Amino acid sequence: MTTLFNQPLNVINVGIAMFSDDLKKQHVPVIQLDWTPPGQGNMQVVEALDQLAEKPLAEKIAAANNIALERIIQSHPVLVGYDQAINVVPGMTRTTILHAGPPVSWENMCGAMKGAVTGALVFEGLATDLEDAARLAASGEITFSPCHEHDCVGSMAGVTSASMFMHIVENKTYGNRAFTNLSEQMAKILRMGANDQSVIDRLNWMRDVLGPMLRDAMNIIGEIDLRLMLAQALHMGDECHNRNNAGTTLLIQALTPGLIQAGYPVAQQREVFEFVASSDYFSGPTWMAMCKAALDAAHGIEYSTVVTTMARNGYEFGLRISGLPGQWFTGPAQQVIGPMFAGYKPEDSGLDIGDSAITETYGIGGFAMATAPAIVALVGGTVEEAIDFSRQMREITLGENPNVTIPLLSFMGIPTAIDITRVAGSGILPVINTAIAHKDAGIGMIGAGIVHPPFSCFEKALLTFRDRYFL
């Protein structure tokens, strides 16, 4: 006993963190065990987990989940073209505005989304100015709908209108297509809620110059293998959500022969290359559409508990589950925690927003941060934490994707197929790295960081799944 008290004190604390915090202040080594009971203590969730574990239902769920996992892994998305939304997006009309996240009314839209909507209405010529656009948006004459319900995804506010050029990504394995608009690059842009004349002028140029050049280039090239390019980008230090240095280089490399052969004036070619070089985010939307094409192939499988959508609109966070097609499970959008740009404070930030969490749903972004340790300079945290995120996400997924691997973790495949029962049982929430938009319209991006979905989304999904399938 005397020997015990003469040894250095090493502490593992389970439960309330205040005890470990006090020990840290006294310079005592301490490990805080981040543990929560199954279902975060909600006995309804615990009961539902037990019910779903009973045979023969558990066997049906396992079989369905194997199919979902296989469809995600076997999906082979390729870029096949670019065209205006009105020509390719299902359900698009001249008076339709698509947005990120689950359904949301004009009244409940956050500042960044309202800014993007009003800017898009001016861009489309449906309103004379931003004030007129706000009146029109509130009038009921504009149809608002989630991108995800139109085979689309949209970064940040995700606002997509008829004239905008879209990526066209085809899943060669299963034949479905996915779409997303072009990157405006970074900072003061529509998708972040900015909407002044400089933003509208850029959108006009993208419609009149960039979009047609990309369209004609792809008509020459035919297709670009995005799954292969994604695997290469991760091996080159990207995680393909918020760090895209390698991916953008690879994508413009593949596009360049077509852009040159398309026959546009040298001055316009230079404008396009300078635009791409202005930010590494050019390939960001490309990966989003790729992930969407793969995950849609796994949506609508009876008995499957796999998450096929995670999306946010600055007001709510929403999930969709393979075995419960057509339903959204929502909870309040969360505060993103991370470094702010100079001059901004956390209280300036809007809540979590964007469809870009489709990347994490697929297994990249926050799930693959071990491939991109340099990203911590943007989103905060340490290299060790970034690596641990990739390990931890394997605990809430059904498998690994051997087509897309993480060199630092002995070429482990990216964690693939989030399972609501594993999230509910472990209490581990998916990790998302993301940009931060200002809470007010008209300003734009003010930082980046880490965020998690609210547990209530998974709770609602699990209980609804139990009610649907447990007989």
Residue ranges and their predicted role:
Residues 2-471:
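Anaerobic metallocofactor- and corrinoid-dependent redox/one-carbon enzyme cores
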